[in-house]
Amino acid sequence: MLLIITLKVEKMNYSKIKKYDISNGCGIRCSIWVTGCNFHCPECFNPELWDKNAGELFDDLAKEKVFSYLRDEHCDGLSVLGGEPLLQGEDMLNFLKEVRFYFPEKTIWLWTGYEISSLKKNSVEYEIIKQCDYVVDGRFKTDLAGKNLRFRGSSNQIIWRNENGNFIEANDIENNERFKK
């Protein structure tokens, strides 16, 4: 019996989908930048993504583009950046559930300005991060920016590894020789 799962994404916009990205997460990744952010961090890497209406609607064609990139045997997983992915609510949750269903062997990384500790259990935002293998949390802070931070913009940000719903600090992954440039 073939099971097909399709969850509706209605209001999520994106700016860019990149097939081969080696900067945002471990290995070769497909990356998507969603639009909309309410943090407006000084010296943000992507201020053009603050407006939720910027970019294009993440429709079935965009989703199929991401899925086709994830089918590539060289692709290790999906990276979700922004903007602020957690502002996408049910749309982001549905999208990540589909990615998890169709590509269980691929890892999912997500960057958010929210801190995991501030998210309410059972909230949509918390359900989103539970779909991810790695979450980089915290707002970008100019005075804590560092050139030697592999997957973070500033040292206050923390890389968390999801181990069965428990988030374990994993900043040491930046020092793994396999992932250095």
Where are these regions (language model features)?
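Conserved Radical SAM active-site core
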Residues: 3, 10-14, 28, 46-110, ...
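P-loop/Walker A phosphate-binding loop and immediately adjacent motor/lid segment at beta-alpha junctions
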Residues: 88-96, 100, 145-181
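Conserved C-terminal portion of the radical SAM core fold
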Residues: 71-80, 107, 136-142, 146, ...
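A generic structural signal for alpha->beta connector loops
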Residues: 11, 105, 131-132, 156
